[in-house]
């Protein structure tokens, strides 16, 4: 019974660790610019190995990036806007 309870506590934490959202950057520190969401989904999933991506404020915003990927530093308001848009 204790093992089962421990499993229920640890499982959600494992899903959260290692994933983040943001503007993934290349080796030069720049996020890809965009006008279409399809381009960003391909860029995020195939180049940066994210779960998905879309165009948010003329740059590719990736959802579900690995923790070791570098992302562009953005304001909290921009991050909330892009996170909210991708969820809805």
Curated annotation (Swiss-Prot):
GO molecular function annotations of the record: sodium channel inhibitor activity; toxin activity
Protein name: Beta-insect excitatory toxin LqhIT1a
Cystine crosslinks: 34-55, 40-60, 44-62, 56-82
Function as written in the Swiss-Prot or TrEMBL entry: Excitatory insect toxins induce a spastic paralysis. They bind voltage-independently at site-4 of sodium channels (Nav) and shift the voltage of activation toward more negative potentials thereby affecting sodium channel activation and promoting spontaneous and repetitive firing.
Superkingdom per UniProt: Eukaryota
CDD domains, alphabetized: neurotoxins_LC_scorpion
Segments forming domain LCN-type CS-alpha/beta: 20-83
Domain topic, free-text comment: Has the structural arrangement of an alpha-helix connected to antiparallel beta-sheets by disulfide bonds (CS-alpha/beta).
Tissue: Expressed by the venom gland.
Family matches, as Pfam families: Toxin_3
UniProtKB keywords: Disulfide bond, Ion channel impairing toxin, Neurotoxin, Secreted, Signal, Toxin, Voltage-gated sodium channel impairing toxin
GO CC, alphabetical: extracellular region
Localization (cell): Secreted
């Amino acid at each position: 019974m204790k093992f089962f309870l421990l499993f229920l506590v640890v499982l959600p934490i494992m899903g959260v660790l290692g994933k983040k959202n943001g503007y993934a950057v290349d080796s030069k520190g720049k996020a890809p610019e965009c006008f279409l969401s399809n381009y960003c989904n391909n860029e995020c999933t195939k180049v940066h190995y994210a779960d998905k991506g879309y165009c948010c404020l003329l740059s590719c915003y990736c959802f579900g990036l690995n923790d070791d990927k570098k992302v562009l530093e953005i304001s909290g308001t921009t991050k909330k806007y892009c996170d909210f848009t991708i969820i809805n």
